[in-house]
Curated annotation (Swiss-Prot):
Gene Ontology biological-process entries: fatty acid beta-oxidation
Species: Escherichia coli O157:H7
Biological or metabolic pathway of the protein: Lipid metabolism; fatty acid beta-oxidation
Top-level taxon of origin: Bacteria
Region (3-hydroxyacyl-CoA dehydrogenase): 306-714
Alphabetical list of NCBIfam families matching this protein: FadJ, PRK11154.1
Name recorded for this polypeptide: Fatty acid oxidation complex subunit alpha
Region span, Enoyl-CoA hydratase: 1-190
Length: 714
């Protein structure tokens, strides 16, 4: 049976051809190699019809134009030559669209990304809607690739080289007004008149490209270009630490096109695309993309979720305020905050106001929309307005008795169906539910700080939590824009459990004489966004170290921090950035002064600050402990799958995405090699480096996680 075409042609009475993009059976339009023949057949018809005045590409999907190329096509390529051929096919198709003798216009509503934007760039003009769903960008770099269907050549010529480089190197997505200002689109209109506006543009002569700003014209010349590429190259190298080969190739390919002409540029683009597709970095980044897509589709349990019409939050602190913001402003669910004093409520409301006001100032949000979202948040010092809340999120202090009291109060003041979700980072959910009359409705919902930025949440059912409670909590997390992983109710859950030994080892190296800046720089070079010492300062030394005794009590000596170091730091009133002094010193609040290591930290912890380890040796010690603990978490079924383990580490603590997560990284090294490294470290530094049994067995058998393990390990 022949597949329904993804591209269909209709010619209007006014001789404007409408090409409708609608990939059958899919929510999103993505470009596949097999569509090329469909488009070519349409192009042939267009060329044969001499009456035509213009062409409009439009999507039939309600919220996307084209979300990009189908990434599975790249995975199916076995060699760089195959991937290069794929790019050349895309380039050729775009060239044929561009070569049509009549105006071709892209009518864009919703996501126009990757290959979708490359198709729009091949058109002679672009009109998009003013809807917040409409975004334009080339995110291929986030998959370790570059745009392979002409994007590296067309975009710089349309909007200028410096702006184009920023878009391609970062994967930055533009909203409609930004795209108009930069000349990426010719008009922005309401959704209701998109097609007619595009048709009107198609009836005119081909839109002439707007002259580039003077700055961009200077940068396009040989001298300006040389300076620009030198400066951007240096900045990019600093940002990526040389871990992402795609950025280097993007610079090379764009410069080739500008210096040697588009023919050389297209050739370089296709070659680079093919080579990058075969790199381990791209394979790892694509695995993270697929894994996160799967996690977002995972309902958490087989039971249907309960309705979520309103949510309550206990505690108006930093976490409570952040949770209120993502619940009201991302999920669109009415929120009521309870705090013991009005200042807490005001603090939480101000948090949402500040976030939304920032969007208004940046013109990402209308003031009326801000007010509408803020109206979803209310506050109280008692339980008025809580009687019919579907789910309550508790964000009070880390105190077991207090949290148990919150459970009792919620059961007394809320409905029989109300779910109680605790935002604890360390207390067992089973203990919090110990005295509950409805323990099946108690669950853990662990957010990471800052709530509005961190993409991960851990959902922690205890032994008695019902399947529906799990499904409902997963549903809420997704509505809040989060990626949820369901983890077992064991001390530290997953993320904090693998993070603690990593940070402990960094502190231990400090006591051995390694310098703060050297340790942090070593882990940034390895690929983490910040080093472990800086991370502790950012989280708050008091907050970040609170979990160490809990983990040591549960799992033994391997979780012990160096004796007296943490207490010495805390006794000296060092909490990190929040009070201006930790391992680093910070300038006054509100001022962007550079942080600097406080030299007083070394005598305080009894260290000399004269290290002997190289950066790779520092990174090895921290990372190996994290890998070992991650494997234990699989073994103890703390995580449901290695997929969840990789996503949890990348999204929860910034494990280097180009390595694919702890389990992909172990696979790339080989379990046997990891065991050998850990045994060497155990001989040098002690038994905490002893590889766990599962790793030793896998190493002996030559097994790997991703090739031998199903996605669900249960």
């Amino acid at each position: 049976m022949e597949m329904t075409s993804a591209f269909t042609l209709n010619v209007r009475l006014d001789n404007i051809a409408i090409i409708t993009i609608d990939v059958p059976g899919e929510k999103m339009n993505t470009l596949k190699a097999e569509f090329a023949s469909q488009v070519r057949a349409i192009i042939k018809q267009l060329r044969e019809n001499k009456e035509l005045r213009g062409v409009v590409f439009v999507s039939a999907k309600p919220d996307n134009f084209i979300a990009g190329a189908d990434i599975n096509m790249i995975g199916n390529c076995k060699t760089a030559q195959e991937a290069e051929a794929l790019a050349r096919q895309g380039q050729q198709l775009m060239a044929e669209i561009h070569a049509l003798p009549i105006p071709v216009i892209a009518a864009i509503h919703g996501a126009c990304l990757g290959g979708g934007l490359e198709l729009a760039l091949a058109c002679h003009g672009r009109v998009c809607t003013d809807d917040p769903k409409t975004v334009l960008g080339l995110p291929e770099v986030q998959l370790g690739l570059l745009p392979g269907s002409g994007g590296t050549q067309r975009l710089p010529r349309l909007i200028g080289v410096s702006t184009a480089l920023e878009m391609i190197l970062t994967g930055k997505q533009l909203r409609a007004k930004q795209a108009l200002k930069l000349g990426l689109v010719d008009d922005v209109v309401p959704h209701s008149i998109l097609l007619e506006a595009a048709v009107e543009l198609a009836k005119k002569d081909r839109p002439s490209s707007r002259p580039l700003p003077v700055r961009e014209r200077i940068l396009a010349g040989p001298l300006g270009r040389a300076q620009l590429f030198k400066m951007v190259g240096k900045k990019t190298e600093h940002k990526t630490q040389g871990n992402y080969p795609a950025t280097e190739r993007i610079l090379e390919v764009v410069e080739t096109g500008l210096a040697q002409g588009t023919s050389s540029g297209y050739d370089a683009e296709a070659r680079a695309f093919g080579e990058l597709a075969m790199t381990p970095q791209s394979q790892a980044l694509r695995s993270i993309f697929f894994a996160s897509t799967e996690v977002k589709k995972d309902p958490g349990s087989d039971a249907p979720p309960a309705p979520l019409n309103s949510v309550g939050i206990l505690g108006g602190g930093l976490m409570g305020g952040g949770i209120a913001y993502v619940t009201a402003c991302k999920a669109g669910i009415p929120v009521r905050i309870k705090d013991i004093n009005p200042q807490g409520i005001n603090h939480a409301l101000k948090y949402s106001w500040d976030q939304l006001e920032g969007k208004v100032r940046r013109r990402h949000l209308k003031a009326s929309e801000r007010d509408k979202q803020l109206a979803l948040i209310s506050g109280t010092t008692d339980y008025r307005g809580f009687a019919h809340r579907d789910l309550i999120i508790e964000a009070v202090f880390e105190n077991l008795e207090l949290k148990q009291q919150m459970v009792a109060e919620v059961e007394q003041n809320c409905a029989a169906h109300t779910i109680f979700a605790s935002n604890t980072s360390s207390l067992p959910i089973g203990d919090i539910a110990a005295h509950a009359t409805r323990p099946e409705q108690v669950i853990g919902l662990h957010f990471f700080s800052p709530v509005e930025k961190m993409p991960l949440v851990e959902i922690i059912p205890h032994a008695g939590t019902s399947a529906q409670t799990i499904a409902t909590t997963v549903k809420l997390a997704k509505k809040q824009g989060k990626t949820p992983i369901v983890v077992r109710d064991k001390a530290g859950f997953y993320v904090n459990r693998i993070l603690a030994p990593y940070i402990n080892e960094a502190i231990r190296m400090l006591t051995e004489g390694e310098r703060v800046a050297h340790i942090d720089a070593a882990l940034v070079k390895f690929g983490f966004p910040v080093g472990p010492i800086q991370l502790l300062d950012e989280v708050g030394i008091d907050t970040g170290t609170k979990i160490i005794p809990v983990l040591e009590a549960a799992y033994g000596e391997r979780f012990s921090a160096p004796a007296n170091v943490v207490s010495s730091i805390l006794n000296d009133d060092r909490k990190g950035r929040k009070n201006g002094r930790g391992f680093y010193l910070y300038g006054q609040k509100g001022r962007k002064s550079k942080k600097q290591v406080d030299p007083a930290i070394y005598p305080l912890i009894g260290a000399q600050g004269q290290g002997r380890l190289s950066a790779p040796q520092v990174a090895e010690r921290c990372v190996m402990l994290m890998l070992n603990e991650a494997v234990r978490c699989v073994d103890e079924q703390v995580i449901r799958s290695v997929r969840d383990g990789d996503i949890g580490a990348v999204f929860g603590i910034g494990f280097p995405p180009f390595l694919g997560g702890p389990f992909r990284y172990i696979d790339s090294l080989g379990a046997g090699e990891v065991v050998a490294i850990m045994q060497r470290l155990a001989t040098q530094y002690g038994s905490r480096f002893t590889p766990c049994e599962r790793l030793v067995e896998m190493g002996a058998r030559g097994e790997s996680f991703w090739k031998t393990t199903a996605t669900d390990l249960q």
